[in-house]
């Protein structure tokens, strides 16, 4: 029997975009300031991959690009696809997504004359890993080592050559871009499952439907949504004592928002 999702269930989209480089006239290499009259072509989105994230499941990613268009740098149709995809998204999963992917996507919506979308919460796997700390590198390639799905290197077209060959309409470069883009999304989904129990912050708000806790009279993990939580000790603050819980599925810790002495249902928040 198919389980019906709550009416306020989150829609979490794992996403990775690739952009064409900006083209400008320059006189030398090295650090320099480039004025707007030197720019010949601005950076545009040339491809993206995405998958719906669900804790404990790595779903196959889907891919879209401008490769077969007459003008590969005209991203208006691709951006419109992104706009449709994200209009109902409550959360976006992206590595360095807060600093790069979302600003580029939102800027593309503006540039293409589309309506603004309500900003989704960004589940940035790079920022979550930085919260944990102590890693030699926070690049996706490093953090996903040893995973079932790891970040793919584009060694067939190393460095910038993947993008330059893609723009030359090399079909092998398009195949490599598809594999590279899709692997990033699938690797991010697996990485999110690993860092989720360790991370904390307001980005988790809405991952668990509010109606779920009210209807079932049960505690739910605010990270993965599991009802399989166990009361483990208490958290004490100047305001009083709160019940603490550990999720038996993802391993994350959470606490009640209400004092222990109050006989009210518990709503959980990350700590």
Show the residue positions of the predicted features.
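Conserved RNase H-like, two-metal-ion catalytic cores of nucleic-acid enzymes
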Residues: 2-86
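Conserved DEDDh/DEDDy metal-dependent 3′-5′ exonuclease domain
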Residues: 56-147
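Acidic, Mg2+-coordinating catalytic module of metal-dependent nucleases/exonucleases
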Residues: 93, 142-214
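Residues immediately within or flanking Cys/His clusters that coordinate Zn2+
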Residues: 216-218, 244
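Short cysteine-rich clusters marking metal-coordination/redox-active sites
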Residues: 221-224, 247-250
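Cys/His-rich microdomains that often coordinate metals
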Residues: 225-229, 254
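Short linker/helix segments within small regulatory modules
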Residues: 233-244
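Short metal-binding segments enriched for Cys and/or His
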Residues: 249-270
